[in-house]
Amino acid sequence: MNSLFASTARGLEELLKTELENLGAVECQVVQGGVHFKGDTRLVYQSLMWSRLASRIMLPLGECKVYSDLDLYLGVQAINWTEMFNPGATFAVHFSGLNDTIRNSQYGAMKVKDAIVDAFTRKNLPRPNVDRDAPDIRVNVWLHKETASIALDLSGDGLHLRGYRDRAGIAPIKETLAAAIVMRSGWQPGTPLLDPMCGSGTLLIEAAMLATDRAPGLHRGRWGFSGWAQHDEAIWQEVKAEAQTRARKGLAEYSSHFYGSDSDARVIQRARTNARLAGIGELITFEVKDVAQLTNPLPKGPYGTVLSNPPYGERLDSEPALIALHSLLGRIMKNQFGGWNLSLFSASPDLLSCLQLRADKQYKAKNGPLDCVQKNYHVAESTPDSKPAMVAEDYANRLRKNLKKFEKWARQEGIECYRLYDADLPEYNVAVDRYADWVVVQEYAPPKTIDAHKARQRLFDIIAATISVLGIAPNKLVLKTRERQKGKNQYQKLGEKGEFLEVTEYNAHLLVNLTDYLDTGLFLDHRIARRMLGQMSKGKDFLNLFSYTGSATVHAGLGGARSTTTVDMSRTYLEWAERNLRLNGLTGRAHRLIQADCLAWLREANEQFDLIFIDPPTFSNSKRMEDAFDVQRDHLALMKDLKRLLRAGGTIMFSNNKRGFRMDLDGLAKLGLKAQEITQKTLSQDFARNRQIHNCWLITAA
């Protein structure tokens, strides 16, 4: 009897144990990452040929304590290697693990290689050559703390390499994991199986091989036992012949069918090739088709199973499309696949909840470093009384109501950018802004007292409902998460896409960037204030401080300002402002752009202006600014500096976002200034619910 070890992906150990026992293995013992078992020589070959779940089959040779590199050398050399190798066989060493002595795996592998070579030369036998790429024998050494475990890898290449997939092709899941997913899906061979996001077809091919009794090792060309001295070619040929006979019989007798589709024509072509090389191409129909076009291939029965490994995203900007995809799949399953089973394997359990289906079973597994879950569902047959479940119904109804109200209003106003929803319902704490045919959903980060999983699920529901109600393509929705700011955090960079969208606001053409920054380049709540500046600017010299992207300057220029001066500390935003001005034909010496710390520039400037717009941050302690700034504390000092630049009869429009801001009217009077609050006049319909989003004042000489 041989003592053997079969390795597998984490989470599949019990499944592998059952498989090995069915092959005839005895004394099976599950450990993390694999199964120890025993069997005769025939079982060695059968486990290699027939295991769909094992990553590798190892023949343990011994262990040794490693307190020095000499211990490792002597421990390896103690094994009778001349009885392991055939004469002339090549070998390679795979070494993993480190300890205080062996701190480099390459060094560990070199010591093992030296010990093996010296074992031959000391017996005056030809030394075996190393072949790292295609060795006849693979020696595996795993060092854990002070113990090194030494084994022969009888598999050669990993057993997931069945021989039907082009090695150049990238597969999101290995074939061994795919086989486990099929086994856990609840699908019964002899019933239809469909994968609507099949990629290169791995799940369907593994299922078809299982259903037709085709051994996973049947198409492999190389094995790790070819140079093993104890290899029995006669028994191996018997095992191989039996597998070929069973495969022919299984294919001839199988009557059901498999269906695969994917939106990528290139991977569908690869899937067809893979299925043909696996010997089951005639059983699978592959189509180039988007999930949105998915239909039941057997509407009159029989019932089957939909099985897939849908995409998941690591970046926030990929989530809206994935949420829409899962929501759509859930609706299609309910509408067209009543009576079928559904099984999905995913690295994002939250996305699976977008299906709006209740799972009957779930399993955990590792896909490389990723923690994954597989959930199985039964889709109930629809009845005349069945009503489709609404996702975030209260939110969807409010958004629909707001859309009806604001869409017509915005069209009449001549604006393309407006707020559709502003945390109207406390449990759906987001802002939804429309920018032409794009939508930005901003989630206000939930408090720590809210369960993170529930908050994420609610956000997914919001996105699915937003896409559905507004009828937009998922790739036209941008998702952002923001903390509630004490001031504008306009300089936070989120990305590097550099994609700008041209929008109209009254008679102005403006550029927005929906993805690269926390803000978009256009503060929607200041829309009316900008229009007022345009109406006030004819024939005047206009100054815009803390100008951001210069949208207020554009309105002033279009309103007939004699000159405009735009000041901001950020070169990025000044260049953006220049593009906005150029877009509206506002070029030349009359339109200056100045990069400077606005507070320092204000103290040193000696020019005169008729109309000044200033929208400072609530608070700033930027390293690039000379002093910390607090708008409540420092607004009088600011007004003192502004007054010096204000021409007789001129006006300052002063705005800020400080909640509860109190204007020091007495202090203003001492400066010879008076203030008129115009906040309510500057709040448009879409911001009527949020009356503290900004405050705005007109300041003139008393």
UniProtKB/Swiss-Prot annotation:
Catalytic activity: guanosine(2445) in 23S rRNA + S-adenosyl-L-methionine = N(2)-methylguanosine(2445) in 23S rRNA + S-adenosyl-L-homocysteine + H(+); guanosine(2069) in 23S rRNA + S-adenosyl-L-methionine = N(2)-methylguanosine(2069) in 23S rRNA + S-adenosyl-L-homocysteine + H(+)
Principal localisation: cytoplasm
EC code(s) of this entry: 2.1.1.173, 2.1.1.264
MF term (GO), any: rRNA (guanine-N7-)-methyltransferase activity
Tagged with keyword Signal: no
InterPro entries xref list: 23SrRNA_methyltr_KL, DNA_methylase_N6_adenine_CS, RlmKL-like_Mtase, RlmKL-like_Mtase_CS, RlmL_1st, SAM-dep_methyl-trfase, SAM-dependent_MTases_sf, THUMP_dom
Protein biosynthesis found in the keyword field: no
Top-level EC class as recorded in UniProt: transferase
Record organism: Escherichia coli O139:H28 (strain E24377A / ETEC)
A cellular-component GO term for this protein: cytoplasm
Encoding gene (name): rlmL
Residue ranges of every copy of the THUMP domain listed in the record: 43-154
Keywords: Cytoplasm, Methyltransferase, RNA-binding, rRNA processing, S-adenosyl-L-methionine, Transferase
Name of the protein: Ribosomal RNA large subunit methyltransferase K/L
PROSITE patterns: THUMP, UPF0020
SUPFAM superfamilies (UniProt xref): S-adenosyl-L-methionine-dependent methyltransferases
Biological function: Specifically methylates the guanine in position 2445 (m2G2445) and the guanine in position 2069 (m7G2069) of 23S rRNA.
Compartments, record wording: Cytoplasm
Protein family per UniProt: Belongs to the methyltransferase superfamily. RlmKL family.
